[in-house]
């Protein structure tokens, strides 16, 4: 049995490594476009399911796939296209609540388990100069919502409810429970 992470995200690799599991990375080549007319909660789950199905090849393999979005005032905020888009996104988040949603799919053979984890975040008021300085670090450019909570944006979030690691792109608590339900050991412990 292979444990496969269907993601090229270095943060997801790092977080899965915290669980003491040996895994291989197999990147899903799918269209991740979400339908803006559908509920983001359901859409992020659908994309994670598509990723898992795209890399599943051999019987017995366990595939982990995730997709993360940020939703603020009903708008889905993906990765910024450029620095101007990053500025627009971070300005929108300034002084507001938003939700980070991660669709998580674990697949083994015909069994497909999908959850959507939601973490609520509040950003304090941000100064335009600090937004520009943060963008200049390059950190926001490959992240949904144009920020990394584990990096410089830790200075922006003054409130959070839910799984911190979900904001980084992999809800590890939910994942551990799901993997154990399939009989996998985490840190040598089986459920």
Question: What are these language model-derived features?
Answer:
Residues 22-24, 185:
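Residue-level detector of anion-binding/catalytic polar loops
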Residues 14-18, 35-36, 57-58:
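Short loop/helix-cap segments at secondary-structure boundaries that form the rim of catalytic
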Residues 11, 31-33, 112:
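Surface-exposed, flexible loop/turn segments at secondary-structure boundaries
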Residues 8, 28, 109:
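Cofactor-binding loop segments of dinucleotide-utilizing enzymes, especially the Rossmann-like FAD-
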Residues 21-22, 148:
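A generic short alpha-helical patch detector that favors 3-5-residue windows
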Residues 2-4, 37-191:
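Anionic-ligand binding patches
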Residues 24-32:
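A short beta-strand-loop structural module common to alpha/beta enzyme folds
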Residues 1-21:
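N-terminal beta1-alpha1 ligand-phosphate binding loop
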């Amino acid at each position: 049995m292979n444990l496969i992470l269907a993601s090229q995200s270095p943060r997801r690799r790092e977080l899965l490594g915290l669980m003491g599991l040996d895994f291989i990375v197999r990147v899903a080549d799918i269209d991740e476009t979400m339908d803006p007319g559908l509920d983001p909660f359901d859409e992020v789950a659908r994309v994670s399911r598509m990723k898992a199905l795209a890399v599943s090849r051999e019987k017995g393999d366990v595939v982990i796939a995730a997709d993360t979005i940020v939703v603020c005032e009903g708008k889905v905020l993906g990765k910024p296209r450029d620095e101007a888009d990053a500025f627009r996104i971070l300005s929108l988040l300034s002084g507001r609540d938003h939700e980070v949603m991660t669709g998580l799919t674990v697949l083994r053979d015909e069994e497909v388990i999908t959850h959507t984890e939601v973490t609520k975040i509040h950003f304090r008021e941000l100064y335009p100069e600090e937004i520009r300085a943060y963008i200049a670090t390059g950190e926001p450019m490959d992240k949904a919502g144009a920020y990394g909570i584990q990096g410089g944006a830790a200075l922006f979030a003054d409130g959070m409810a839910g799984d911190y690691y979900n904001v980084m792109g992999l809800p590890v608590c939910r994942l551990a429970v799901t993997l154990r339900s399939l009989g996998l050991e985490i840190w040598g412990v089986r459920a």
